[in-house]
């Protein structure tokens, strides 16, 4: 007796014997196929790609022969990408400035058993981050005396940096050589000027 796939219920079986001439009486019995909890089946999830410092959400789906309520669990193979599930929506959030790839594993659970895991790759593409210039305190210099400052900045991408500067007044000229900023007041000038520096 071979029940159909996922069938549960009862069936009546009638059995007779025959000697090729006459048949016996018929024996009837009932077969009961008891239900078992079927494992949910999680739908495949495509690989995903996002830019650095962005999040992404994907919708999850699964089937369950028993019609059980499905919940989902997800995990990342790196602490640089966090996973969070609300209902059937999976949200993935990389940490700030992370780029690279993460393998995400997802399972569906029907309250009793887990599905086979589905894995996919989340690729986080790098973007060029703006450098951060170290703050410069207000400066003073005697009349007719140039002043040279050493500039400093950081860049999470490790790029080579150049500097530029602009003076708010023609009475103070600025020049940049490497990371050195030289401020040269005009002859006999005294007063103030605002210097804007960028990296």
Predicted feature locations:
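Acidic, turn/loop-rich segments in luminal/extracellular domains of secretory-pathway
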Residues: 1-38, 46-71, 75-129, 137-199
């Amino acid at each position: 007796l071979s029940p159909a796939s996922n069938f549960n219920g009862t069936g009546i079986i009638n059995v007779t014997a025959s000697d090729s001439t006459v048949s016996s009486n018929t024996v009837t019995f009932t077969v009961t196929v008891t239900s078992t909890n079927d494992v949910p089946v999680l739908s495949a999830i495509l690989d995903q790609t996002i830019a650095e410092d962005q999040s992404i959400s994907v919708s999850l789906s699964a089937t369950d022969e028993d019609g059980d309520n499905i919940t989902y669990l997800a995990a990342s193979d790196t602490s640089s990408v966090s996973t969070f599930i609300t209902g059937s929506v999976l949200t993935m959030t990389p940490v700030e400035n992370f780029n690279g790839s993460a393998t995400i594993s997802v399972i569906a659970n029907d309250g009793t058993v887990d599905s086979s895991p589905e894995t996919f790759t989340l690729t986080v593409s790098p973007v060029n981050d703006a450098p951060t210039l170290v703050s410069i305190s207000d400066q003073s210099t005697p009349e007719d005396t140039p002043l040279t400052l050493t500039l400093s900045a950081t860049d999470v991408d490790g790029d080579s940096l150049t500097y530029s500067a602009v003076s708010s007044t023609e009475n103070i000229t600025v020049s940049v050589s490497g990371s050195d900023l030289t401020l040269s007041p005009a002859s006999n000038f005294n007063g103030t000027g605002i210097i804007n520096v960028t990296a």
